[in-house]
């Protein structure tokens, strides 16, 4: 998850977003990993369905005078003998919010880029790459039910939160009304996330 906006010591100039993120008294023990690395960690566990069991982290502060990390690489061990790599940086000059996700398996791999959020690449071992797009009949039922716009229109950040709130509201409503539907899985974060 590379970003470049903290490539200079802008917190010394009073930039509010940088000031609190790089201040240990406010941000805590980490800046880069605590800020954007946590998003990567959450996505890794959510997408794979596996928990991180061990890690080896190299957190670095490259910008002189900064009190917390601004770059980090982490080697991960997950359940089912799975390995992973997490890289988060706020000093990658030229990058905005370049979140990229790749999952590799025995028969293929998945590739997704935040800069092209409506596209999922499915690479196969012995077949051509498939390009999956939102709001098309070739994606799963859950994906279709969480899509608000026709194919070709970008789904946005706000819509993702709307899906979470909608799923939580539906689960809560069904609990209050004592409705049970075992076939419906409401996807929203809980205290364990």
Range-by-range predicted roles:
Residues 11-13, 17, 21, 46, ...:
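C-terminal glycine/acidic-rich active-site capping loop/insertion
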Residues 38, 87-95:
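Glycine-rich phosphate/pyrophosphate-binding beta-alpha loops
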Residues 1-66, 120:
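Predominantly a Rossmann-like dinucleotide-binding segment in NAD(P)-dependent oxidoreductases
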Residues 51, 80-82, 91, 106-109:
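Short acidic/polar mixed-charge low-complexity motifs
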Residues 67-71:
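A short, glycine/Asx- and small/polar-enriched loop/turn
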Residues 35, 189-192:
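Residue-level signal for the nucleotide or nucleotide-sugar donor/cofactor binding architecture
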Residues 63-66, 92-95, 111:
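Short glycine/serine/proline-enriched coil/turn segments at secondary-structure junctions
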Residues 85-88, 112-113:
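Beta-strand scaffold of nucleotide-dependent catalytic cores
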């Amino acid at each position: 998850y590379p970003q470049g906006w903290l490539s200079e010591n802008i917190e010394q100039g009073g930039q509010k977003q940088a000031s609190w993120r790089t201040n240990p008294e406010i941000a805590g023990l980490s800046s880069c990993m605590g800020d954007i690395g946590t998003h990567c960690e959450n996505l890794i566990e959510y997408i794979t369905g596996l928990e991180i069991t061990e890690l080896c982290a190299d957190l670095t502060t490259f910008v002189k005078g900064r009190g917390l990390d601004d770059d980090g690489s982490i080697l991960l061990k997950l359940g089912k003998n799975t390995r992973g790599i997490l890289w988060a940086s706020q000093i990658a000059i030229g990058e905005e919010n370049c979140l990229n996700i790749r999952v590799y398996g025995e028969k293929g791999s998945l590739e997704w880029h935040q800069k092209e959020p409506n596209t999922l690449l499915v690479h196969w071992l012995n077949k051509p790459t498939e390009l999956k797009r939102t709001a098309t009949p070739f994606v799963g039922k859950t994906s279709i039910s969480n899509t608000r716009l026709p194919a070709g229109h970008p789904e946005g950040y706000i819509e993702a939160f709307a899906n979470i709130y909608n799923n939580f509201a539906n689960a809560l409503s069904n609990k209050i009304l004592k409705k049970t539907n075992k076939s419906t899985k409401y996807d929203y974060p809980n205290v364990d996330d």
